[in-house]
Structures are given as structure tokens and as C-alpha cells.
Amino acid sequence: MKYDIPTMTAEATSLLKSLISIPSLSREETQAADFLQNYIEMEGMQTGRKGNNVWCFSPMFDLKKPTILLNSHIDTVKPVNGWRKDPFTPREENGKLYGLGSNDAGASVVSLLQVFLQLCRTSQRYNLIYLASCEEEVSGKDGIESVLPGLPPISFAIVGEPTEMQPAIAEKGLMVLDVTATGKAGHAARNEGDNAIYKVLNDIAWFRDYRFDKESQLLGPVKMSVTVINAGTQHNVVPDKCTFVVDIRSNELYSNEDLFAEIKKHISCEAKARSFRLNSSRIDEKHPFVQKAIKMGRIPFGSPT
């Protein structure tokens, strides 16, 4: 069968509607992975599977050739209360498809799969691997990170995200801190106790106001945001513990370890990093693929996420 753009678009849209209909929250992607794996196998491709990661190789895979990875993720964030309609019911309105994960990153999942299937119909000078991975939204260790060591060497990767077809050539790193202040419980009506909430106020203000010196041309400054806070059990008890979470997005001029060491110099509360492994990454703007994208009119940029 000869495939053209309208046919590929129709098939990708149909598949995307099916995926939207299957809830696939991070770490709960089994049903979506099962469906996608079956879909790929119905297209005549052999699949691999690890956890909820699904992949397939182009026919006549030759280790002497360079290998291009096509990757995007099947998991989504949880739907927020602002949804006015069922987030798992796909609907088309004014040429747009709505539903949880339709854009991030279902559109990339189905588009890259159509490209993979089309390119596999003829011989290429390179190998292709298509990988639909899980746990991207939570930076989970059971996502793509768990699969890559078992794949053949990758020469280049195209990762699908909603970038309006502009190439992201750099990405900020991520470090999440759990910060704790410890006080002493007491009755709110009496002059007793040591309020843990008051202990965090200066540190929270520091995270809000502090600016790291080094700014990246592509990624800008390091960004720190306090995103969660918890304290107290009831209105008349002075809380003896207050915790808050800080989301930190690093540029390539700092490692997460460097940032953590600097932060600890400025705050009084106890801080623990959940992980240091997600440092900033980038590809040289002079890379041939990046230069090809520029010649096509694309504008490289640095992604904050």
C-alpha cells in the first residue's frame, strides 16, 4: 500500500484517539503499553518490552550502520480540576484534538510511529529504533533510563515533545529538594512551643529571591520554585514540623551537586536531594542534524523542562 501524508495523518489521529481513551498516568501505563505493543505487532513488527516501555527495530538491522532512535513517552500527568470535560474522551473541535496527553506527548508518540513505519518500507542507510517509554513525567528510573543500556549503540536520537516543530538542543536539569524544619509542639493559646512554620519562612524567602550568578545563553538562569508545603495537625496546636518541596531547574553551568552545596550554605533547615542524576544536557549547535534543521527554517532553543 502506498502511504501519503493524509493517510498517515488519519492513522496517527485514530491511534492517538485510542491512546487518549486509555488512562496512562505515570507508573500506571500498563494498559496503554499493552495496546500500543499490540498495534505495532499488527503492523508486522516484532516488539521488545521492559516494564511499560515498548520498542521495535527496523527490518534488516545492521550493527555496521548508524542507528537513529525515535522516542517519546506514553505517560501523562494527572488531570487537574480545571478540566471541563472528560479528559479521557477524545474530541475534535475546530481542527484540534482535545484529551489528556493529546499534546504531551501522544501526538509525538503516534507521529514518530508513522514515520518509523513509513521509513521501514524501504531500505535506509541507517537503522531505526522506535521506543515508546514510560515514567517520563516523573523522571522515573523504570522509564527510558532502564531500557537504553540494553539497546544497540545509538548514534542520534529524536525525542518527540510539543515544541511546535522547533528543535530543542539543550534542556535544563532537575533537582527536587525535601526541606524540613523541626520545632516543638505546644498549645496555640499559650506562650509555649517552637513553631516550625516560622522556622521555614526565611528559607522560603531565600529560595524565592536568590539568583545564581551564571546564566546560560540558551537556558537562562537557574530557576528555583517552592511548590509544596505541609505543616500542622489542627488549629490549636503549634506545629513541631514543617516540610516543603523545592523544584530546581539547572543550566549547564552548574551541576546539581554544585547547586546543592551552595544552597546548604544559605538555608538553616535540613535539606535532602531526591536525586542528583538529572543534570542539564545539550547538543552542539554545529552538529550536522542541527545545522540541517536550521537550513529548513527551524530555530534551535533551550527547553526549561
Name each region found by the language model.
Residues 1-79, 241-245, 259-262:
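N-terminal helical capping/dimerization or prosegment-like subdomains
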Residues 7, 178-305:
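Metal-dependent amide/peptide-bond hydrolase catalytic core
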Residues 18, 114-121, 202-209:
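Short glycine/serine- and small hydrophobic-enriched flexible loop segments
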Residues 41-45, 50-52, 64-65, 121-125, ...:
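Short glycine/proline-enriched coil/turn segments at helix->beta-strand junctions
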Residues 65-129:
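Active-site metal-coordination/substrate-binding segment of hydrolases
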